[in-house]
Amino acid sequence: MSQTLDGEGKLVSMIMEGIQYARFAAICDDQGNILWNSQRNEVDNILTLEETKASLKRSIDTWRERENLSEKIGKGRYAIVGYDKIKRITIPLHNGHMLFVSVEGEKPEYIGDIMKIVEYAESHR
């Protein structure tokens, strides 16, 4: 079954084309089901598909916990978690979906690109 590229699919494609340090990008629903994803061809998987899904689900659960504090500290815009090998960026989308981007570990150049994605996601709410 082929899918037509909707706005979220285009966003994933834009990330992979526009951020040279991006390893993986995905959009999930609020249950952690992967709706769109792309992985750079020359990149080896660090996690298995099941480990990736479990990690995405934990991230979604963490965002739900953050929402409990939003009245006091404001709505969360994005989160960056640094690991030795990668950085994982999560950005909530307007429809309850979540954008995940995994980038190479020590590449500070990507931060400006990530902020452009955050601004893009916020402007399409």
Describe the function of each predicted region:
Residues 1-125:
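Non-catalytic interaction/Regulatory regions outside core domains
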